[in-house]
Amino acid sequence: MKVLVLGAGVAGVSSAWYLAEAGHEVTVIDRAEGVAMETSFANAGQLSYGYTTPWAAPGIPTKALKWLFKSHPPLLFRPDGSLYQIEWLWQMLQNCTAAHYQTNKERMVRISEYSREMFRRFEAQTGMNFEGRKKGTLQIFRQTKEVEAAKQDIAVLERYGVPYRRLKPEECAEFEPALARVTAKIAGGLHLPADATGDCRLFTENLYKLCQEKGVRFHFNQNISRIDHNGLRIKTVETETGRFEADAVVCALGCFSRTVLAQLDLNLPIYPVKGYSLTLPVTNSDGAPVSTVLDESYKVAITRFDNRIRVGGMAELSGYEIKLPEKRRETLALVVNDLFPEGGDLSQASFWSGLRPMTPDSTPLIGRTRFDNLFLNTGHGTLGWTMSLGSAKLTADIVSGKDTEIRSDDLSLSRYQA
């Protein structure tokens, strides 16, 4: 079967890999000049299987209001002038009940744990290097009230069987030795040993090469202008420079899935949530992180690659703009300099922003649409890297008409159309 994948980020390229593995003739198109040029370019680098949790949770509306008044807020809301922004926020607020949280959490954990297994199989199969590390996540708390608040998170970890260890301030240095220099700034910690890290862009670039070896064709600089269909069947996808026919189409366009598929009267509940990152060279390995550290106060993650440190986080609801305000850079620089002052060179740091495709219930859209041959693999929010291989394998199995290895019937767009 000929399958056309829309999007060459980690979701699209991973989908292409599993579709090719299943024996399909696969073509990938993207508007960028290469793979992983947008949301997958410089994310925080965390494979956060243990930290898979919905944004929409009980108590979040109150927390969000408090964050807005902080000097370095982890969440920022800027009206984009659209009614849709308000509608999306309202849908998210409706998911902030305990019942919805539990349903959404179960779905997300299911995908993330499956993705963990897919990464295990993939690495055993390919031996790919993407600067990955399996040394866990260390969440640090700067205030006693954060330590107390974490008890609710720990209860969730226990409910879903996620291994963890609570840490006293001085014990944090067991996992991140450089933090011994700043123990006085830490009130406690939480270590999740089963989490991992890796460079999403490097992974996607290497997977692109493996896909090519399997015969997958890539066409870049392709802006989609029109999708033609005959009844409930997609016939062709037209770009400004070409026309592509396929037996099946997979949409993995991240935030732009909504705008591209709007012409088909498909209403995808995806909103772009902007995030930021700094990438700086390691200057002193002993003063740099070993794995990934999540600063609970600032909602910022600091992740170690081979010779680089990635500092990423924050969430901004401001539409599709990707400006780089100096204030956000200052927040990232403040956090990494406060915890790892001797680790890297901020004067050589590169500053980046990207748009995460977030759904109101934080769960991605995977599977069928009302069109017989149009499938989705999009809307992963901040967990696109974590869920990438699991989501892609699910998508490939659904396209192929195979039984999926985990439940997938509640992941499709239909849950918003009931």
UniProtKB/Swiss-Prot annotation:
Its EC number is 1.4.99.-. It holds the Pfam family DAO. One of its GO terms (molecular function) is D-amino-acid dehydrogenase activity. Its cofactor is FAD. GO terms for cellular component: cytoplasm; plasma membrane. Keywords: FAD, Flavoprotein, Oxidoreductase. Gene3D superfamilies: D-Amino Acid Oxidase, subunit A, domain 2 (3.30.9.10), FAD/NAD(P)-binding domain (3.50.50.60). GO terms for biological process: D-alanine catabolic process. The keyword Oxidoreductase applies. It comes from the Bacteria. FAD binds at residues 3-17. It is an enzyme of class 1 (oxidoreductase). Oxidative deamination of D-amino acids. This is D-amino acid dehydrogenase. It comes from Neisseria meningitidis serogroup B (strain ATCC BAA-335 / MC58). The lineage of its organism: Bacteria, Pseudomonadati, Pseudomonadota, Betaproteobacteria, Neisseriales. The gene is dadA.
